[in-house]
Amino acid sequence: MDKNFRVNTNDERNIWLSTAVNENLTMASSSSQPQPISSPFHQPENQVNRVNPGSHYYDLETLESSFGGLSFNDSSVGQNGDSIHLPRRTNQVFTGSSSGGAGDDNGYLLPPMGSHHHRELEELQRHNYLNQLRMSYQNDYAHQSYWYNTDGDGNGMLNNGFLNDVPSSSRDRVSDYYTNRFGYEGYNYWRGNEGFDYNQCQASFSAFAKDKEMSERLGMSIFQGTKETVDAIYNGLIGDICELMVDPYGSDVVQLLMRRCSSEQIVQLVDIVTQQMFQFVNICIDSLGTNAIQVLLTCINERAKDQIPRIVDVVRTVALQLSKSNHAIFVILACFRLFPLHCRLLLELIVQNCHQIAIDQHGCCLLQLCFNKDRVPNLEIRQRLIMEAIANALRLCLNCYGNYVVQYIVELNNRYLIDALVRQLIGNYAHLARNKYGSHAVQKLLKLRWIDSRVIVIDLLREIDTLLLDPFGNYVIQTAWFVSKDDVRRMLRYHIERNIPMMRCNKFGNKVLEKLNI
């Protein structure tokens, strides 16, 4: 067969055609006079074969008529390279309306009614119709062309079915993508033409919750469903609740579910989540899991208050681990915000380890958030933590993270707290000014307009000779110059002019002279 001659058909048609060819070969071999088999694809120009049911040419004519409904790459080229002229036809579906081998209006010759080939053709039509209907349902699912009501009313099935203009290749992609996606038999209940059956799908709820599309539908069922619906979903998810809390899609489903849970179900959730401490910590330090735990704390505060001491004690046990995570610190904050009367032991633990927490990258953020009244409304908790930070101010100012805690206290603009901080650091300002991190805290204190900067400047003058030449201290002296007035500035000028010869030989000293125009 010529390489340019290619049949573009489906596997079902190939089966029917191969059957016809085999029967034709059998009849030809049983004939009394052997003769070569004629090719059904080659027809001399202007030649018309009459249909004679009594000869083997009838089967050849039938086979040729069936191929007339197929498309070819080049219909003008025969097997032997000869040109043939056939009527221009497009792919059409056999209707079976003609009978007895008579041709229809388009020149098709169909098998006679009741013949073996006619039964094959009817079966092919039925198979193609069911296959098209199945792909139509799958296309509806892919484009969300359905509506669903969790209360039981509504059709719960796919309604679109408009696939007449969709290419076969597009339909196949839809079918391939959505076929047995998770390997769960229950998954088909979400895509079928029947309503959602919770009993049948209960074993696959976890798989649904982890899928993007299915989790949205599951969340809508939780949000709009009845108590029986919520209970069914709860029973299907409770076994994998810890895993779902840290899942990209399952976490949202769990949070919606917890907001609909009863007090007994909340208690059961607490039992499971706190059963193993390392698992609880892993959930808290996860970016998604921490949100789920915070929702659980909110639900405990609303519907299971008897569980408050228990959950706070669990958080206290692992508080130091949680304070070192940028996600888990919000669990501690949630306890301070929701359960201020039950957090005495937790507060004492944070206070006792204030320095250790403050010099941690994420612990310093925890303390700053605890100082914020919007985050921790309870004044007693805030004051206790702030005063403990002030007591450790000197060591904190020298740390790359701890100095941010001290600076945040300054930014609170509370005179009582700032006066306490200034007094706490007296005698150490020169030492802090020579430190990379401490110099920032000293400069921030000097810039406060409503405090008496004289106390800080006098402390700096004790070591002015070294500060003028120090990589960090020179910036503190420049700040002190601009914020000081009258007699304090005159004292600074005196010491600066006294050190001009030495400052001229040092790049940091020159910076001071250039900045002050001296």
Curated annotation (Swiss-Prot):
Family annotation (PROSITE patterns): PUM, PUM_HD
Cellular component terms (Gene Ontology): cytoplasm; nucleus
Pumilio repeats: 206-235, 236-271, 275-313, 314-348, 349-387, 388-423, 424-459, 460-494
Residue ranges of domain PUM-HD in the record: 178-518
Listed Low complexity bias regions: 29-44
Entry's Gene Ontology molecular function annotations: RNA binding
Compartments, record wording: Cytoplasm; Nucleus
SMART domains xref list: Pumilio (SM00025)
Main location: cytoplasm
InterPro entries: ARM-like (IPR011989), ARM-type_fold (IPR016024), PUM-HD (IPR033133), Pumilio_RNA-bd_rpt (IPR001313)
Region of interest (Disordered), ranges: 26-46, 77-114
Domain of life: Eukaryota
Keywords annotated in UniProt: Cytoplasm, Nucleus, Repeat, RNA-binding, Translation regulation
Signal peptide boundaries: none
Record-level GO BP terms: regulation of translation
Pfam families: PUF
Matches recorded under PANTHER family: PUMILIO HOMOLOG 14-RELATED, RNA BINDING PROTEIN PUMILIO-RELATED
Domain description: The pumilio repeats mediate the association with RNA by packing together to form a right-handed superhelix that approximates a half donut. The number as well as the specific sequence of the repeats determine the specificity for target mRNAs.
Its job: Sequence-specific RNA-binding protein that regulates translation and mRNA stability by binding the 3'-UTR of target mRNAs.
Record's protein name: Pumilio homolog 14
Species, as recorded: Arabidopsis thaliana (Mouse-ear cress)
Gene name as annotated: APUM14
